[in-house]
């Protein structure tokens, strides 16, 4: 048994010759906040494993519900046989801090530089520092607060994709917050 559900992301990478690839990753997570660091776990036989190991960088693209078919396609097809970026009609934008490109259609893109690779077994874990991120302007409110619920992000569990709820069910610390007393006449 493994932890479920998990986020599902599209990872873009580029080899030393400048060839782009995209693949789906469900084993992804935050591993540190200062400095901000993420991890992705990849099987060594995957094409993108070689690209990422060569360049020591990648970009995590958070897909929305409307990109679920492309997410699945990029997880079941190999970049060795097909140009997945072309097949999915993704628009690539050059990274700001890394040579890899990100997918413009994804509402959130996170540029990463690898700090460590841990061999685990079926997968190797790539631990990477977040260098910068790109967030769709439509996710911000007038006070510059990010509303990820507007992004319609997706998750993965036991071979199925799920959309995430659009409403918050709690707020960090709400379980211990004290209720304010009402003042008469106020």
Stretches found by the model and what they are:
Residues 1-186:
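Basic, polyanion-binding surface patches
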